[in-house]
Regions:
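Cell-envelope/extracellular polymer assembly enzymes that use nucleotide-activated donors
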Residues: 6-8, 36
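Active-site beta-to-alpha loop of glycosyltransferases that engages the nucleotide-sugar donor
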Residues: 11-22, 43
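Short, acidic, metal-binding catalytic loop of nucleotide-sugar glycosyltransferases
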Residues: 25-34
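A conserved acidic beta->alpha catalytic loop
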Residues: 26, 41-50
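Short beta-strand/loop segment that forms part of the nucleotide-sugar
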Residues: 35-43, 63-65
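Glycine-rich, basic loop-to-helix element that forms the pyrophosphate-binding segment
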Residues: 65-85
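Short beta-strand-to-loop acidic/aromatic patch adjacent to the donor-nucleotide binding site
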Residues: 86-92
Length: 92
């Protein structure tokens, strides 16, 4: 069994702030604690970056690649970032 501290949930978003808020709320409601949530903001223009800065969520890591990489590109970017953080398993 993998320790929750070695798990990263990768969430990719682009101009879907309301859906991102729902997704993060669901992740916060998990009974397992200690995992990392890595949000890849694909250069959103809807206030997503500002919203993410206001959060006080343990384990939250935010990345903005500076351009919209698309869904698959965003997940590939997020998985690379998660590996750089030392995670052993990724939720996508």
């Amino acid at each position: 069994m993998i320790d929750a501290n070695a798990v990263t949930a990768v969430v990719v978003t682009y101009n879907r702030l309301a859906l991102l808020q729902q997704c993060l709320a669901a992740l916060c409601a998990q009974t397992v604690r200690g995992f990392t949530v890595l949000v890849v903001d694909n250069a959103s223009t809807d206030g997503t970056a500002d919203y993410l800065k206001t959060l006080d969520m343990p384990g939250l890591v935010c990345r903005n690649p500076g351009k919209n990489l698309g869904g698959a590109g965003g997940f590939a970017y997020g998985i690379r970032e998660a590996a750089a953080l030392g995670c052993k398993a990724v939720w996508i």
